[in-house]
Swiss-Prot record:
CDD domains: ATP-synt_V_A-type_alpha_C, ATP-synt_V_A-type_alpha_N, V_A-ATPase_A. GO terms for cellular component: plasma membrane. Has multiple subunits with at least A(3), B(3), C, D, E, F, H, I and proteolipid K(x). NCBIfam families: PRK04192.1 (NF003220). It holds the Pfam family ATP-synt_VA_C. Belongs to the ATPase alpha/beta chains family. It is a peripheral membrane protein. One of its GO terms (biological process) is proton motive force-driven plasma membrane ATP synthesis. It is found in: Cell membrane. This is A-type ATP synthase subunit A 2. It catalyses: ATP + H2O + 4 H(+)(in) = ADP + phosphate + 5 H(+)(out). The gene is atpA2. It comes from the Archaea. It comes from Methanospirillum hungatei JF-1 (strain ATCC 27890 / DSM 864 / NBRC 100397 / JF-1).
Length: 584
């Protein structure tokens, strides 16, 4: 083991001498307190190390020990429903050791070494296996956890066990003597191997109308949620974590307030997944690196989360990774870069900011997993961005924009008007619309894309008309343009607006979304058809069905909702008859 000494201390960055033979990203123990750190630069016999603990009290000439291995995470049964810090130390175990505040230098393994798991083998002695093949399964809550052959390992099975084991017990031995346990270790900065990347063509359904219908995201895609203070980034991320159509959710609190992680911990055990009926906490893995924790560990928390997500992807599962927020990671990069005395880029961020962001987001994807059996899994990354003052021209927002396929722009003005989710429908976009068009046409309705396009046209037309209204008032507009304003208002208030705290409206099934939008567009068509027959606009906007349209989001009976479209046409037709008979 290489042992050096501390030569310089600058906040979370220290320089150690006599480190010849060390490699980049090796984990080291710093000082007599054995603080964990990672080598981020090598210069001659000196190593520059970022420390994942508070460096207060460290002194020059204290020892630095190189472990010789990169920063890695432990992968295996026991990850689900766990909460870790940025370097995969389980917070409940840290609390048991040190109380409310984490003491420095405490290292606890990521997976429980005492708990026993029932291992059911699916392979037999004499069979050939390769990287990614499933050796057996373990029941982890309601999910079947596959125990796979680790990357880089293959051969003939010599023995395979059955029964209850801890994660460190050997469950399989290969003919060449390789022993396989239920525990794998994998370096966080290196993506796990797969066979082939697939086209993103299956939408990630979230139960949120503005996301699913207007700006869809795909499984294996990337999305960003930028917004200023109070625009609803965290509530949006938590809503996606609750209702996303995935088997596993990895929620990373990167530099955010501790109360937000507390919300997740208190709410998720009480909420049930609408698709499985099981508590949401049983499919969630939380990584809490709150704002008062060391800044260097923010980068580690991001990489820890994506590595865990890739592990479940390799089992053939769909995984959603939610990072809240990547801006705090960027700020940590800026602080460490300043300590390293590197040449600053735009707004003080390091020149390699775009490279780091791209390397993270590119680990998303829908892939054919490694192994002889064909499995398809996906990792979808949704990153919140917190631009100072809501300024979308700042570097992190701009660099993420180049990478992300879906852009959900949160608007402070909408948030102040209590319109949630406060997604600005003019500034937001999705690059996946054409990819999911066939899926929606086959699974939902052939005219889904048409209705969505017409709704977007009405909303864009409203923005143009609002400029005229501000100058001359709404009464100066002709009736055909007043209709556009009224229907746009219905789309905004009765379709796009959705309460995260309503039992009836927090999750909206896709078929219900389609029928809600269809009824609104049909109402628009019915009004225009009746106006051509000289029916007064005032009467058309006050038909009894108008109040039913406003209450669609609370309507649980889909058949009753479908009948509403016929009621709309009947009531507008009856108005025409009444108008004609009155004129006669």
């Amino acid at each position: 083991m290489i042992t050096g000494t501390i030569a310089r201390i600058s906040g979370p960055v220290i320089t150690a001498r006599n480190m010849t033979g060390s490699r980049m990203y090796d984990v080291v123990w710093v000082g007599r307190a054995a603080l964990p750190g990672e080598i981020i630069r090598l210069e001659g016999d000196e190593a520059v190390i970022q420390v994942y603990e508070d460096t207060t009290g460290l002194m020059i000439h204290e020892p630095v020990e190189n472990t010789g291995v990169p920063l890695s995470v432990e992968l295996g049964p026991g990850l689900l429903a766990s909460i870790y810090d940025g370097v995969q130390r389980p917070l409940p175990a840290l609390y048991a050791k040190s109380g409310n505040y984490i003491s420095r230098g405490i290292m606890v393994p990521g997976l429980d070494r005492e708990k026993r798991w029932a291992f059911n083998p699916v392979k037999k002695a004499g069979e050939m296996v390769q990287t990614g093949d499933v050796l057996g399964t373990v029941q982890e809550f309601h999910l079947v956890h596959s125990i796979m052959v680790p990357p880089g390992v293959s051969g003939e099975i010599k023995t395979i066990a059955s029964g209850e084991f801890t994660v460190t017990d050997v469950v399989c031995t290969l003919a060449d003597g390789t022993e396989i346990t239920m525990l794998q270790r994998w370096p966080v900065r290196k993506g796990r191997p797969f066979v082939k990347r697939l086209d993103p063509e299956v939408p990630l359904l979230t139960g949120q109308r503005v996301f699913d219908t207007m700006f869809p995201l795909v499984k294996g895609g990337t999305a960003m949620i930028p917004g200023g203070f109070g625009t609803g980034k965290t509530v949006s991320e938590q809503t996606l974590a609750k209702w996303a159509d995935t088997q596993v959710v990895v929620y990373i609190g990167c530099g955010e307030r501790g109360n937000e992680m507390t919300d997740v911990l208190t709410e998720f055990p009480e909420l049930t997944d609408p698709r499985t009926g099981y508590p949401l906490i049983e499919r969630t893995i939380m990584i809490a690196n709150t704002s008062n924790m060391p800044v260097a560990a923010r980068e580690a928390s991001i990489y820890t989360g994506i590595t865990i997500a890739e592990y479940y992807r390799d089992m053939g599962m769909d995984v959603a990774l939610l990072a809240d927020s990547t801006s705090r990671w960027g700020e940590a990069l800026r602080e460490v870069s300043g300590r390293l005395e590197e040449m600053p880029g735009e707004e003080g961020y390091p020149a390699y900011l775009a490279t780091r962001l791209a390397a993270f987001y590119e680990r998303a994807g829908r892939v054919i997993c490694a192994g002889s059996e064909e499995k398809t899994g996906s990792v979808t990354i949704i990153g919140a961005v917190s631009p100072p003052g809501g300024d979308f021209s700042e570097p992190i927002t701009q660099n993420t924009l180049r990478i992300a396929g879906t852009f959900w722009a949160l608007d402070a003005n909408l948030a102040y008007r209590r319109h949630y989710p406060s997604v600005n429908w003019i500034r937001s976009y999705s690059l996946y619309l054409e990819d999911v068009e066939d899926w929606f046409s086959e699974k939902v309705a052939r005219d889904w894309y048409q209705f969505r396009g017409r709704a977007m046209y009405i909303l864009q037309k409203e923005v143009e008309l609002q400029e005229i209204v501000q100058l001359v008032g709404p009464d100066a507009l002709p009736d055909k343009e007043k209709v556009v304003l009224e229907i746009a208002k219905i789309i905004r208030e009765d379709f796009l607006q959705q309460s995260a705290y309503s039992d009836d409206d927090s999750f909206c099934p896709l078929e219900k979304q389609y029928w809600m939008l269809k009824i609104i567009i049909w109402y628009y068509d019915a009004i225009r058809a009746a106006m051509r027959r000289n029916v007064p606009l005032r009467q058309l906007l006050s038909i009894p069905a108008r109040s039913e349209i406003a209450r669609m989001k609370e309507q649980r009976d889909l058949d009753r909702l479908k009948r509403l479209s016929d009621i709309v046409w009947e009531q507008t037709e009856n108005l025409e008859v009444q108008t004609c008979s009155t004129a006669a």
